[in-house]
Amino acid sequence: MSTKFVVCHSRKGGVGKTTLAYELAWLLGAPLVDLEWEGGSASRKWGYRYEDRTSSSLLAAFEKGTPPRLLRGFNKPDLVPGHPDLELNQPSRDGTADALLKWAGEWGRDWVVVDTHPGATEVVNGALSIAHVVVTPVPLRSSDLDGTEHMVRELADYPVVLIPNFVPPVAPAAEVHRLGRIVDGTPVQVGPLIPAALAVGTRRKRMAITSEDPPAKALQPVATALRQVAAFVQEYTA
């Protein structure tokens, strides 16, 4: 069985990347590999505290070449937790790719979702190199579109799908047109949009939004959109 890799990546922080990775991992039944070393990571969202551990299973797995043990919880994705020390102890691009492929073979899942640190580093580039789809949330804001434009120029030959995120009820026309211009002439695709909802940012539950049936009323349009994104990813990689 060949595992498909979904890599959630952007060149800017604060765009909703981690939430999207978390929800996609749940919807696809995928382990979530957290390669983020800053605060606000998927690991913290999951309830994992590296401060309470004496070592990092992620760093040990990269060093020893053995698959890390997946952490499991209720109504949230299985997790390989990240660690701040990854920033200064990154494996090479090829070392990262080889490790992720080996782990996926051991886990035997159809999908693996990888959440990355913003920007281009060795460990990030390793994950991108094996991605079947690179999912990038894009708020329709000038500075975020600047970062997206730069990323598309660099990664136009990668399987990139842009997901308009935090979209207000009336989307800003100028930014919508700019997004179209950014992908024009490239194979980069634009997937389903995710509507803005203040409740996403203030929610404290660790469970995936899409694990609740039904979620809170304010989150229901977001949950519907997330399921549409998951379906798009499945069709894209079919």
Map each language-model feature to its residues:
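Short, well-ordered beta-strand core segments
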Residues: 30, 112, 134-135
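NTP-binding/hydrolysis catalytic cores, primarily Walker-type P-loop NTPases
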Residues: 209-238
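Beta-strand-loop-alpha "switch" segments that mediate conformational coupling across diverse proteins
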Residues: 166-214, 226
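P-loop/Walker A phosphate-binding loop and immediately adjacent motor/lid segment at beta-alpha junctions
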Residues: 91-99, 150-171
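Short, conserved loop/helix-junction motifs that constitute active-site signature segments
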Residues: 129, 153-158, 183-184
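P-loop/Walker-type NTP enzyme "switch/lid" segment
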Residues: 31, 35-108
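Walker A/P-loop phosphate-binding motif and the immediately C-terminal alpha-helix
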Residues: 2-37
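Inter-motif core of Ras-like GTPase G domains
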Residues: 119-142
